[in-house]
């Protein structure tokens, strides 16, 4: 059987050596600065000839830090490291595309922290189990 990969975990693993990254839910004792990876949508895309079944996922990456500058820097680094991992083909992810990058706001959960969000589109082959 083939099934979609766990996009959140694949992204977290790709970032593990460079950025403190969590999949939802964010733990109560999270480290700063960090990113939270959340899949917010997805679909199956059968159009890639020669590659097989491909899934696409819309994912948000939320960066949390003590300052605006640190939140932005952490998010920029996470995106850069993820692009590197995708292009080096060391993850199940085949591609990623940055769709939006927000300005910083106060974190609604922890107003003492700054939050910056990016939305990306990723694609990956289905995993066989």
Q: What are these language model-derived features?
A:
Residues 82-129:
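Acidic-leaning, charged glycine-interspersed low-complexity segments
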Residues 48-54, 108-111:
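Short, solvent-exposed beta-strand/turn "edge" segments of beta-rich domains on protein surfaces
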Residues 57-59, 69-77, 96-100:
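Low-complexity, flexible helical/coil segments
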Residues 46, 70, 127-129:
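Intrinsically disordered, low-complexity acidic/polar segments
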Residues 53-71, 113-125:
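Oligomerization/assembly interface segments of phage tail-like spikes and tubes
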Residues 65-87:
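Mid-chain, well-packed structural core segment of small domains
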Residues 1-51, 73, 85-94:
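Small/polar-rich, solvent-exposed N-terminal microdomains that initiate assembly or binding
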């Amino acid at each position: 059987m083939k099934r979609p990969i766990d996009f959140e975990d694949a992204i977290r693993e790709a970032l593990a050596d460079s950025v403190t990254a969590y999949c939802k839910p964010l733990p109560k004792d999270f480290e700063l600065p960090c990113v939270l990876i959340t899949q917010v949508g997805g679909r199956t895309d059968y159009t890639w000839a020669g590659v097989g079944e491909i899934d696409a996922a819309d994912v948000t990456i939320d960066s949390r830090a003590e300052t605006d500058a640190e939140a932005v820097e952490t998010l920029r680094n996470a995106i850069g490291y993820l692009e590197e991992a995708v292009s080096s083909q060391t993850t199940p992810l085949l591609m990623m595309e940055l769709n939006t990058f927000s300005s910083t706001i106060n974190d609604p959960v922890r107003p003492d922290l700054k939050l910056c969000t990016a939305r990306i589109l990723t694609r990956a082959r289905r995993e066989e189990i």
